[in-house]
């Protein structure tokens, strides 16, 4: 029973999130995204490992919740924009991006399964994919890391069980 409920939440959750995501002003989304990205990539920024993004734009599209943003490095700082001309684009569903962030899925595997789509500048895409592959959970603030791992465990378990769907035939009320 709980497995079925978890599976339904995992499979229907993104569609439920899409409405609040659409209604949230981009200024608030930008603030949250810049804070989270800055936390996660602070060391990489300090070490110059994100110089490849200086003046170039990465588009990230979370398909199932219809969330898209563009990020770049400007004067050594990660910035998020609502609109930009993307040099490379990454798109995937929220659960797949969550699994990558939690180190439970490999970006290459998702790419070859066509669950992670990378388009645009090949070299820049490879740099970004390698950066995703090198995410160090230990660099995250503990509260964020724990939340990410618990959510990833929940989603992973929910993805293993297909949600139960009732079969209806023509003429039956839905």
From Swiss-Prot:
Keywords: Ubiquinone biosynthesis
Disruption phenotype: Deletion mutant is unable to synthesize ubiquinone under strict anaerobic conditions. Mutant shows normal levels of ubiquinone after aerobic growth.
Pfam families (UniProt xref): SCP2
Keyword Nuclease assigned: no
Taxonomic superkingdom: Bacteria
Pathway assignment: Cofactor biosynthesis; ubiquinone biosynthesis
InterPro entries found in the cross-reference section: SCP2_sterol-bd_dom, SCP2_sterol-bd_dom_sf, UbiT
HAMAP family in the cross-refs: UbiT (MF_02231)
Role summary: Required for O(2)-independent ubiquinone (coenzyme Q) biosynthesis. Likely functions as an accessory factor.
PANTHER family: SCP2 STEROL-BINDING DOMAIN-CONTAINING PROTEIN 1, STEROL CARRIER PROTEIN 2 SCP-2 FAMILY PROTEIN
Name of the molecule in the record: Ubiquinone biosynthesis accessory factor UbiT
Protein's organism: Escherichia coli (strain K12)
């Amino acid at each position: 029973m709980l497995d079925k409920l978890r599976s339904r939440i995992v499979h229907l959750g993104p569609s439920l999130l899409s409405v609040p995501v659409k209604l949230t002003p981009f200024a608030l989304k930008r603030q949250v995204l810049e804070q989270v990205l800055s936390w996660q990539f602070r060391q990489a920024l300090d070490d110059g490992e994100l110089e490849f993004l200086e003046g170039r734009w990465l588009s990230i599209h979370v398909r199932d919740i219809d969330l898209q943003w563009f990020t770049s490095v400007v004067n050594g700082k990660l910035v998020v924009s609502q609109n930009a001309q993307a040099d490379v684009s990454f798109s995937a569903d929220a659960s797949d991006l969550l699994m990558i962030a939690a180190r439970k899925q490999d970006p290459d595997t998702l790419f070859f399964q066509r669950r992670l789509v990378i388009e645009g500048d090949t070299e820049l895409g490879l740099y970004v994919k390698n950066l995703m592959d090198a995410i160090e959970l230990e660099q995250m603030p503990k509260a964020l890391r724990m939340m990410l791992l618990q959510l990833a465990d929940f989603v992973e378990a929910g993805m293993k069980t297909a949600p139960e769907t009732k079969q209806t035939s023509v003429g039956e009320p839905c």
